[in-house]
């Protein structure tokens, strides 16, 4: 168990979770395989600096045991839990809000360990804070197409570009809707992909406003095509923001939303 005075400090739950994470990496094919991840011929691989020189099934057993110990302790002691969407029939906006507040709020029961960058977000203070990451100079590390395609459809079906293209549905890869007479913005929007995509990546057509104190998704959509109002020529030139046609979304809230809120970087979450 823990309380607000322990946020940001190491707890037993955080230490146990870190052990699980380390053992998961150790057991993964990145380090644990019959051949080195980079082929096996590099100096680092020959000296066994970046892998074990072979496959060891016991590493997966140790990872499993550590995870069991963690969840047994969690079942006994409680406190940590996933942030849940509210309502009898949650909408995609509800799931997005639950996901967002699960990592961004300082007292979220999902957070097993977090670190501090700054006490609170004063926006224009010049401190190296979250808003500094969302300007043209700093936010040039954009998501890849491969990363975006990892997120499934909203019903859990894996996304497959070739199949979607063959079905003539590429224009539905992020959302669908209708244009009503006299309106310039899309109405009756249906988000077609896993809600976590829209909380991780800014995609074409995504409404620009997110809620902080309540569930809300609205505003003008992002125009990320070549010549669009947001991307401009960046995606064509593969430079600056939207260089890949996408942008990072996490910790990306408006100045009025995040103003004077406590800031943290989540190192370990229960969902991990």
Question: Which ranges hold each PLM region?
Answer:
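Active-site beta-strand/loop architecture of penicillin-binding DD-peptidases
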Residues: 217-269
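An aromatic- and glycine-enriched ligand-binding surface/loop that stacks and positions planar moieties
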Residues: 12-13, 21-228
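Long, amphipathic alpha-helical regulatory blocks in the mid-to-C-terminal portion
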Residues: 1, 63-66, 72, 251-252, ...
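Flexible helix-coil transition and linker loops at the boundaries of alpha-helical arrays
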Residues: 1-8
């Amino acid at each position: 168990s823990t309380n607000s005075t322990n946020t940001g400090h190491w707890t037993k739950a955080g230490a146990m979770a870190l052990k699980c994470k380390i053992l998961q990496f150790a057991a993964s094919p990145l380090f644990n395989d019959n051949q080195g991840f980079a082929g096996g011929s590099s100096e680092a691989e020959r000296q066994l600096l970046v892998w074990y020189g072979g496959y060891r099934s016991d590493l997966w057993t140790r990872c499993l045991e550590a995870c069991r110990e963690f969840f047994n302790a969690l079942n006994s002691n409680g406190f940590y839990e996933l942030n849940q969407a509210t309502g009898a029939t949650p909408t995609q906006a509800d799931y997005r809000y639950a996901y967002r507040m699960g990592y961004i709020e300082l007292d979220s029961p999902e957070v097993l360990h977090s670190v501090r960058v700054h006490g609170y977000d004063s926006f224009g203070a010049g401190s190296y804070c979250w808003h500094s990451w969302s300007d043209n100079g700093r936010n040039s590390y954009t998501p890849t197409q491969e990363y975006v395609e990892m997120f499934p459809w909203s019903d859990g079906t894996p996304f497959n570009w070739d199949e979607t293209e063959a079905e003539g549905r590429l224009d539905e890869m992020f959302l669908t809707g209708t244009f009503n007479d006299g309106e310039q913005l899309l109405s009756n929007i249906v988000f077609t992909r896993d809600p976590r995509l829209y909380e991780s990546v800014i995609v074409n057509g995504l409404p620009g406003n997110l809620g902080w104190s309540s569930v809300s998704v609205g505003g003008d959509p992002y125009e990320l095509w070549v010549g669009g109002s947001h991307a401009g020529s960046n995606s064509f030139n593969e430079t600056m923001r939207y260089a890949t046609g996408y942008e990072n979304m996490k910790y990306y809230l408006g100045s009025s939303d995040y103003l004077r809120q406590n800031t943290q970087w989540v190192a370990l979450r229960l969902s991990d």
